């Protein structure tokens, strides 16, 4: 994707300011912010500083007729951007950059931006629910919710915005809801949902059907793995069963339900082989999968913690940021995910995310390489027609 294509997307976001008083174009401010975040900026002052240092380069792609806005102007403008419009642009942009292939595993999970709280205004930290493609390590979209407990309402909103056809959607127990399962099936996709106590009857049925002693000599479809790390050996057993008579009532309640899945994890110390713990996790799925596919799917879902949440915290300083004005925390979170997608997709620059950000800060040639790194699908006029209706 060319830099001009990115600018085309940015330019569609509505500017709510009084145009007669505007000194700095919204597209210029957003382009500056995206480039600065890619280059390692985490605060408003750092975004302004980047702009002053790279003004001549920025003028190649934007107007910047009145130079670089001060940090407070950047903060005020970004904080007033319509968050829903931004979310739609983000998703449309990612669909241009990343063509989802049939059968991809898409993990949906939430993360609290810890620094976004504001005690003075009695405002708690916001919670972002993201869709993450495990195959390519990119974020496909995000939706904000005011608390983790509101994920149940945020997940359907995110599902509505995404093209999920023929993919497997994995969600933890918070998203194990009948309406969410139905929504996924309506989107022509399949689900793999973790089952815990919030679905009491279903969870109890699993406990009755799959007690611990059944695993010692299980005759059905199973797949096991072993992993030795930090002096511990962990054995994981995965089993998949068709829906049995005990679960026939649940077939009517959960749209498309086909498989009952169980993951047993047994940990022991390597030296004395003493047991450290056994955990059992239950899942339901609409996909006609076997035990090996199930093992791969739940492993892929766990990767969102390290491949997305951990990277945002450690490599991109998301939790440390005190940006919290208006919609700013949500918008900057989305821009950081855009930056992360671009940095990961750029193979011309060697190194991890942190090293790439430092290289981008040192040389504008690297910025151009990163911005052009998304798959060259181009900006289609049919997309522009839809986006102008935001």
Curated annotation (Swiss-Prot):
Keywords, sorted A to Z: DNA recombination, DNA-binding, Transposable element, Transposition
Pfam family, one: DDE_Tnp_1_assoc
Entry-linked InterPro entries: ISAs1_transpos, Transposase_11, Transposase_11-like, YbfD_N
This protein's record includes keyword Transport: no
One MF term in the entry's GO annotations: DNA binding
Superkingdom of the source species: Bacteria
DNA-binding among keywords: yes
A single GO BP: DNA transposition
Family affiliation: Belongs to the transposase 11 family.
Entry protein name: Putative transposase YncI
Source organism of the structure: Escherichia coli O157:H7
Organism lineage string: Bacteria, Pseudomonadati, Pseudomonadota, Gammaproteobacteria, Enterobacterales
């Amino acid at each position: 994707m060319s830099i001009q294509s990115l600018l085309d997307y940015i330019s569609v976001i509505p500017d709510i300011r009084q145009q007669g008083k505007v000194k700095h174009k919204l597209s210029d401010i957003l382009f500056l912010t995206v480039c600065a975040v890619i280059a390692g900026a985490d605060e408003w002052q750092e975004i302004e500083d980047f702009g002053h240092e790279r003004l001549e380069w920025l003028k190649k792609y934007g107007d910047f007729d009145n130079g670089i806005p001060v940090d407070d102007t950047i903060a005020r403008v970004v904080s007033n951007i319509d968050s829903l419009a931004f979310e739609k642009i983000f998703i449309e942009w990612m669909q241009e950059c990343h063509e989802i292939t049939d059968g991809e595993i898409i993990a949906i999970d939430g993360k609290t931006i810890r620094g976004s709280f504001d005690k003075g205004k009695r405002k708690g930290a916001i919670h972002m629910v993201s869709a993450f493609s495990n195959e390519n390590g990119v974020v496909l979209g995000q939706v904000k919710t005011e608390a983790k407990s509101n994920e149940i309402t945020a997940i359907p909103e995110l599902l509505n915005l995404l093209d999920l056809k023929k993919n497997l959607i994995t969600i933890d127990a918070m998203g194990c809801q009948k309406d969410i399962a139905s929504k996924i099936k309506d989107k022509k996709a399949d689900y793999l949902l973790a089952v815990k106590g919030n679905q009491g009857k279903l969870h109890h049925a699993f406990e009755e059907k799959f007690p611990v002693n059944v695993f010692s000599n299980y005759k059905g479809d199973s797949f096991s793995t072993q992993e030795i790390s930090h002096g511990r050996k962990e054995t994981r057993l995965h089993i998949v069963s068709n829906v049995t008579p005990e679960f026939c009532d649940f077939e009517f309640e959960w749209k498309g339900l086909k498989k009952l899945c169980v993951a047993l994890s047994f940990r022991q110390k390597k030296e004395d082989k003493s047991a450290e713990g056994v955990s059992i996790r239950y899942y339901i799925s609409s996909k006609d999968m076997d035990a090996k596919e199930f093992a791969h799917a739940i492993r892929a879902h766990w990767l969102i913690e390290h491949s997305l949440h951990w990277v945002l915290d450690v490599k991109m300083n998301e939790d440390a940021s005190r940006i919290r004005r208006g919609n700013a925390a949500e918008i900057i979170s989305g821009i950081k995910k855009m930056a992360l997608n671009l940095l990961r997709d750029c193979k011309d620059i060697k190194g991890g995310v942190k090293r790439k950000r430092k290289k981008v800060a040192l040389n504008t040639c690297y910025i151009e390489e990163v911005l052009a790194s998304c798959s060259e699908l181009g900006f289609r006029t049919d997309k522009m027609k839809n986006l102008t209706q935001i």
